[in-house]
C-alpha cells in the first residue's frame, strides 16, 4: 500500500509538514513504480543504534540500500530497499541484524563508530558479517550531514518504492530538523556519505577539472 507523502503524513502521523523548510524535498525522491525491485550491484545496510525498550528511549533504526542503474546509459543511483525502526534491547537487535543481513545478502553493514554501536559491531563480526564502523568527518552535525547529501537527491539519484516504509523515510527526511524523530534520517545520511566516499555515487559537480578521472570504488 502507498499514499502520497502529505496525505500519508496527515492521515497516519497527524503531523503534516510544510515543504518549504525541508532540506530534502519530497519530490527529489524518484519513485520506483514497478512491483519488483531492480537488480542491484551492491547492497549496504546502515544502522543507528540504541539499546533500550523504554518508551522514552531513542529508536534503533536500520535502512537497506542498493546501487543500480535505472537505464543502461544512466549513472549509478541508489534505491531504498527497506527500512525499519524500533525500541529493541541488545539481543533483539542482534537477532534482527543477523536476519536482515541474511535476507538481503548484504555486502556491507555500516554502523556509526559510537559507544552504542560497539557491542553490535563486535557481535556481528563474530558471526562473520562484514561490519564497517563509520566515523563522519569531525564537525559534521546532523544538519550539516543532511545538507551534504542533498545534492544527490536534487540530482535525481535516490529512488524509493511506493511502500509504507519508504513513505516513513521520506516523511521523516522532509520533516528534518523539526520532526519528532530523526533515526531513519541518520541511517540515510550515513549510507549516502559512505556511498559517495566509496565512489559509488558521482555528481557532475565533482569534476570541475575535465582531466579528473572517476574515483575508484571502495568495496570495504
Where are these regions (language model features)?
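Glycine/Thr-rich phosphate-binding loops that ligate phosphate moieties of nucleotide
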Residues: 166, 170, 190, 200
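Acidic two-metal-ion nuclease catalytic site recognized across multiple nuclease folds
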Residues: 21, 191-220
